[in-house]
């Protein structure tokens, strides 16, 4: 054990973070990352018969076909892919005017009505019937998700 009188003050250093391996060569790091990305893209290209750089299908074991995104919610559509589909990009069939108009307004109204009906039902609320939405949720326990079961242990009776 050390004595309290043996305590030496630690010299104050301005930097806590130390460069242990020398300065970073950003050009070499970029080349390494580009080489790794090119290797991953080549492996994916051979595996899936699809060129992910140009986004074109290749000949091979898989047959790729275009799926229109009319049935998908807008959350799943990236802004770039939606504009390319609408504009009819390279090697893609042009879209008709009916497809560019989007969903019919009556479909949108029916969807919003069904959503409001679901949210107004109190028995579907997380706190159960009769609880207000403003309250905090209680802490969940393991038995909320799994039913507790008694384990049967068979043993011989003592005579």
Curated annotation (Swiss-Prot):
Residues 17-24 are annotated as: Required for binding cyclins. Phosphorylation of Thr-140 or Ser-141 impairs binding to PCNA. Phosphorylation at Ser-112 by GSK3-beta enhances ubiquitination by the DCX(DTL) complex. Phosphorylation of Thr-140 by PIM2 enhances its stability and inhibits cell proliferation. Phosphorylation of Thr-140 by PIM1 results in the relocation of CDKN1A to the cytoplasm and enhanced CDKN1A protein stability. UV radiation-induced phosphorylation at Ser-78 and Ser-141 by NUAK1 leads to its degradation. The modification Phosphoserine is found at residues 78, 112, 125, 141. Keywords: Acetylation, Cell cycle, Cytoplasm, Metal-binding, Nucleus, Phosphoprotein, Protein kinase inhibitor, Ubl conjugation, Zinc, Zinc-finger. InterPro entries: CDI_dom (IPR003175), CDI_dom_sf (IPR044898), CDKN1A (IPR029841). Residues 147-159 are annotated as: Interaction with TRIM39. One of its GO terms (biological process) is negative regulation of cell growth. Expressed in keratinocytes (at protein level). One of its GO terms (cellular component) is protein-containing complex. Residues 53-58 are annotated as: Required for binding CDKs. It is found in: Cytoplasm; Nucleus. The keyword Cell cycle applies. A zinc finger (C4-type) spans 12-40. The modification Phosphothreonine is found at residue 140. A motif (PIP-box K+4 motif) lies at residues 135-159. Induction: By p53, mezerein (antileukemic compound) and interferon beta. GO terms for molecular function: cyclin binding; cyclin-dependent protein kinase activating kinase activity; cyclin-dependent protein serine/threonine kinase inhibitor activity; protein sequestering activity; protein serine/threonine kinase binding; protein-containing complex binding; ubiquitin protein ligase binding; zinc ion binding. Its main location: cytoplasm. It comes from the Eukaryota. It holds the Pfam family CDI. The C-terminal is required for nuclear localization of the cyclin D-CDK4 complex. The PIP-box K+4 motif mediates both the interaction with PCNA and the recruitment of the DCX(DTL) complex: while the PIP-box interacts with PCNA, the presence of the K+4 submotif, recruits the DCX(DTL) complex, leading to its ubiquitination. May be involved in p53/TP53 mediated inhibition of cellular proliferation in response to DNA damage. Binds to and inhibits cyclin-dependent kinase activity, preventing phosphorylation of critical cyclin-dependent kinase substrates and blocking cell cycle progression. Functions in the nuclear localization and assembly of cyclin D-CDK4 complex and promotes its kinase activity towards RB1. At higher stoichiometric ratios, inhibits the kinase activity of the cyclin D-CDK4 complex. Inhibits DNA synthesis by DNA polymerase delta by competing with POLD3 for PCNA binding. Interacts with HDAC1; the interaction is prevented by competitive binding of C10orf90/FATS to HDAC1 facilitating acetylation and protein stabilization of CDKN1A/p21. Interacts with MKRN1. Interacts with PSMA3. Interacts with PCNA. Component of the ternary complex, cyclin D-CDK4-CDKN1A. Interacts (via its N-terminal domain) with CDK4; the interaction promotes the assembly of the cyclin D-CDK4 complex, its nuclear translocation and promotes the cyclin D-dependent enzyme activity of CDK4. This is Cyclin-dependent kinase inhibitor 1. It comes from Mus musculus. The gene is Cdkn1a.
């Amino acid at each position: 054990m050390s004595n309290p009188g043996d305590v030496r003050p630690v010299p104050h250093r301005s930097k806590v973070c130390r460069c242990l391996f020398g300065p970073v060569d950003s050009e070499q790091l970029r080349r390494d990352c580009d080489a790794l990305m090119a290797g991953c893209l080549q492996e994916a290209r051979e595996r899936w018969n699809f060129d992910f750089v140009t986004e074109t299908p290749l000949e091979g074991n898989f047959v790729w076909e275009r799926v229109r995104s009319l049935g998908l919610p807008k959350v799943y559509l990236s802004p770039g892919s939606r504009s390319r589909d609408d504009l009819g990009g390279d090697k893609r069939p042009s879209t008709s005017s009916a497809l560019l108009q989007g969903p019919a307004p009556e479909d949108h109204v029916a969807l919003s009505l069904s959503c409001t009906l679901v949210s107004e039902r109190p028995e579907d609320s997380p706190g159960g019937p009769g609880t207000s939405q403003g309250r905090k949720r209680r802490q969940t326990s393991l038995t909320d998700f799994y039913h507790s079961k008694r384990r049967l242990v068979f043993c011989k009776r003592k005579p």
